[in-house]
Amino acid sequence: MSTDLGPEFLEKYTAIENNLKKRFMRKPNISEATEEFSNLAVQCELAEQPPFAGICYLEAAKCESSIGNTVGSAEYLLMSARQFMKAELKLSSLKCVSPGRENLEAAISSYLHAHSKYPEKSPLRVAVITELAEALERLGHHSEAIQYYRYCLKDYNSVPETTGCELNILSKIATIYLKKENYAEALKIFKIIDSAAKVLDYKPYIQRCEVNILLLYLIVQPSPDNVTTEANLVKRYTIVSDEEPCLNEEYPIHPELFLHLQSVLFACKTNDIKALINLNTEMKDFLAIEQMDLMHVLIETYETMT
């Protein structure tokens, strides 16, 4: 597939713009210009030139906005944003960094402009910003991704019945903090998720949070003034009973995993690194990848303390 747009692209683009400017002779045909810009954008996509496609979709969005077609304008803005982001992702994959972040800034601008076009209580507002945040996360711009994920949470407050989606966004934020090795902030977010999940009875979230909160507590070792949730959790795992632990509605933790976590807590209290290493192997069938990573961090943390 050819990636050369040739001189025809600039000629076509200029011709469309010139037709729009002929206001003294006749009223410009906005719908026709929109279609022409859209068709030119498709040609750019086929030629694998996403920045030029983004520019053309942006012009189409302006045309739709000029005739009061808010929805049409938003759709073209979103198409523009995706093309600019595609260009940025391609540069990132090639390890090419643009100091001016031209494509990325154009993408962010188009995403935010599209977001502003949708009604305040529309779920599409949240979807647009979520898409932007996810793209930023893929690019490794974690702080910016968190910023826009938090922006999503503000939008969710005005959209009915979105609590489950809010948990998903909070989960994404917590995951980024884990990637950044900011375990204190990750612990705070998982505590928020845990509280909400218990109210909503979202069992998968409850189990994930319980394991993560315990491991993060042991890694971070926060001050006694900030450990109310963790203290109650640790108390549950400190109690030794002759009865075998069982699954229940409030704490859907597998009995064997419960015993392993109990052993982890005791191993940390006694600085038994060998026991932690053995438990890490024994627990692998019960832990998600992020929790296995936390176990490795926990072992490293206590190795440096001995």
Question: Whereabouts are the PLM-identified features?
Answer:
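Internal amphipathic alpha-helical repeat/solenoid segments
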Residues: 2-6, 15-76
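Residue signature of alpha-solenoid helical repeat architecture, marking inter-repeat boundaries
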Residues: 7-11, 28-31, 48-51, 71, ...
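TPR repeat positional signature
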Residues: 12, 16, 36-37, 50, ...
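Conserved small-residue packing positions in alpha-helical repeats and bundles
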Residues: 16-21, 41, 54, 61, ...
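Hydrophobic/aromatic side-chain positions at a characteristic register within alpha-helices
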Residues: 25, 45, 65, 99, ...
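TPR-repeat structural position
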Residues: 30, 50, 70, 104, ...
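Eukaryote-skewed repeat-based solenoidal scaffolds used as protein-protein interaction platforms
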Residues: 78-79, 87-205
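Structured C-terminal portions of repeat-based eukaryotic scaffold domains
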Residues: 149-154, 162-306
